[in-house]
Swiss-Prot record:
This is Protein chibby homolog 2. Belongs to the chibby family. SPERT subfamily. Transmembrane segments: none annotated. Keywords: Coiled coil. Residues 206-215 have a biased composition (Basic and acidic residues). Residues 180-231 are annotated as: Disordered. Pfam families: Chibby.
């Protein structure tokens, strides 16, 4: 393309408020406009900056990528927490398997009153999901909070459909004693007397019987409330003892593991010490052989010097004689 092809008359020479120090010449050919920049005619389409919609698309893309990155980071942190919890549960399961393999456990012995209270109540406890306990868990009780933290330990036994083992403490089994037989017998007697009275009463004495029932109901309610609280205290005490015993056995397991690891480390240290001694002996042998070789090399060097020295002397004398003869 030559300069004659351009229409120089249509060149735009007007320039209001230039943004640069110099104004680049422009020429229009057909529907395209060229600008002279750095010694070249360049199409203005290639010199225009990016449009605003493109910038918006790029910003939206970066925002989406940033949100995805934040979600990935949150999921990663949650995964780390779940791994830690899984590790803790695995260690507890391992400790319980070790205790189960040892013949150190006995079964908890429940009294008749506690079994009756367990059967009467229909509220499940988080500690024993297969049994019915007659008390509610209060968040303020520290002992229950501690037992709740170790509830996963007890869930293992319920999954296996086995009774919860305890440990011989001072060669005696921890047994839940019966303390409310008198209260339960009083309840049974009162129930039997009321049933017999209902069977013997006639239609004429119905009003008197109703009055007697109203007078006896509060006493029966009081007798029902008292043994339930005592049973709850007994169950809480048994759970506290169980938790303490489990802690003791976990400590013993940790101590046994530490001892085993200590013995293993001692054996490894002994093995490495023996290997070190062997390597040291080999190093001394190598040093001795190297010193012998160096002494032999020195002796050979001296012998070579003794042999070659007279030969070099004769050759030097011959060269001196030839040089003298050549000068003459």
């Amino acid at each position: 393309m030559t300069m004659s092809a351009f229409d120089l008359t249509k060149q735009s020479t007007r320039c209001t408020k230039p943004e640069m120090d110099c104004v680049f010449p422009r020429m229009k050919v057909r529907d395209e406009t060229f600008t002279f920049i750095d010694g070249k005619w360049v199409n203005e389409v290639h010199c225009q900056p990016t449009f605003v919609p493109q910038r918006r698309l790029l910003s939206k893309k970066t925002e989406n990528e940033w949100s995805i990155w934040e979600e990935n980071r949150a999921l990663w942190e949650e995964n780390q927490v779940l791994r830690i919890e899984n590790r803790m549960l695995w260690e507890e399961n391992k400790a319980l398997q070790y205790l189960q393999s040892q013949n150190k456990g006995v079964q908890l012995v429940y009294s008749d009153t506690i079994q009756q209270s367990l059967q009467k109540d229909h509220k499940l406890s988080p500690f024993f999901p297969e049994r019915h306990l007659g008390f509610q868990v209060s968040p303020g009780n520290k002992a229950l909070q501690l037992v709740r933290e170790r509830s996963s330990v007890l869930e293992f036994f319920h999954r296996q459909n086995r009774t919860v083992p305890t440990i011989w403490k001072d060669q005696q089994a921890i047994v839940v004693h019966e303390e409310n037989k008198g209260a339960s017998s009083v309840q049974k007697d009162t129930e039997n007397t009321t049933a017999a009275g209902e069977g013997s009463l006639g239609p004429t004495c119905q009003e008197e019987h109703d009055a007697k029932e109203e007078s006896t109901t509060p006493t029966q309610n009081d007798t029902k409330i008292a043994p339930s609280t005592e049973d709850d205290n007994e169950i809480l005490q048994a759970l506290q003892d169980l938790y303490q015993i489990l802690r003791v056995f976990l400590k013993e397991k940790c101590l046994s593991d530490d001892r085993e690891s200590l013995h293993a480390l001692q054996d490894e240290s002994k093995f490495f010490q023996e290997e070190y001694k062997k390597l040291k002996l080999q190093l001394n042998n190598v040093k001795n052989t190297v010193s012998d070789i160096t002494t032999q090399m020195e002796m050979l060097e001296k012998e070579l010097i003794a042999i070659t020295f007279p030969i070099y002397e004769e050759a030097g004398k011959n060269m001196a004689n030839e040089y003298q003869l050549g000068e003459m």
